[in-house]
Amino acid sequence: SSLTAWNHKNFAPHAKKIVIDIDPAETDKLDMDIAVRVDGDLAAVLPLLAEQEYEMAAELPTWQTYCARMKEKYPAITAEMRAEKDYVDAHVFVDELSRQLTADDVIVPESSGAAGEITYQALRVKRGQKVKNAAGLGSMGFGVPYALGACLANGKRRTILIDGDGAFQLNIQELATIAQHRLPIKMFLWINGGYASIMGT
């Protein structure tokens, strides 16, 4: 619920929702209409889905037109964000970072809060880059160890962590591991008076 917010009924209210979860108790927590519920291991369910025939191709142009309209209506970077102020706007920062990143970079946004959410909104991904999803599912402090693991798992490719100052402190001891293995991890920390997710609950 930390990723979809707490008002489940307003989560994609007009969408047909299909929920696949290995733990039925997790699906039971969702207070929303679920069109198809599958209690099972995704490893077993995905091959079954791959065997099905879908009639999505006819709807694809309509969906692409809708997406283009939404991108125009809700741009990731607005003129107001670009306006000069006494701090760097987070969206503008991610936009500039996107410009400077290379096709070989691995990008790891923090698992919770603005560092993750804004990065996913404003990052322009280049072919060849790897952007790691917030596999911590909102767990604060996930960023530093996740960047460490992502760097090692990708052959020590340059790894970019975008983290909030509060979350960064929770696993700061992993800096010793990063230094010991001389990992090419660059960290951008947002000093944003954070803990917004916690303060909002």
Show the residue positions of the predicted features.
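Glycine-rich, acidic loop regions that bind phosphate or pyrophosphate groups
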Residues: S1-Y66
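A short acidic, amphipathic alpha-helical/loop segment
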Residues: A5-H8, E96, E174-T177
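Generic enzyme active-site microenvironment
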Residues: V19, V108, I162-D163
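Active-site diphosphate/adenylate-binding microenvironment
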Residues: A68-C151
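Structural motif corresponding to alpha-helix initiation and N-cap regions
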Residues: A5, H91, Q169-I172
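Thiamine diphosphate
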Residues: F11, T27-L30, R37-D39, A43-L49, ...
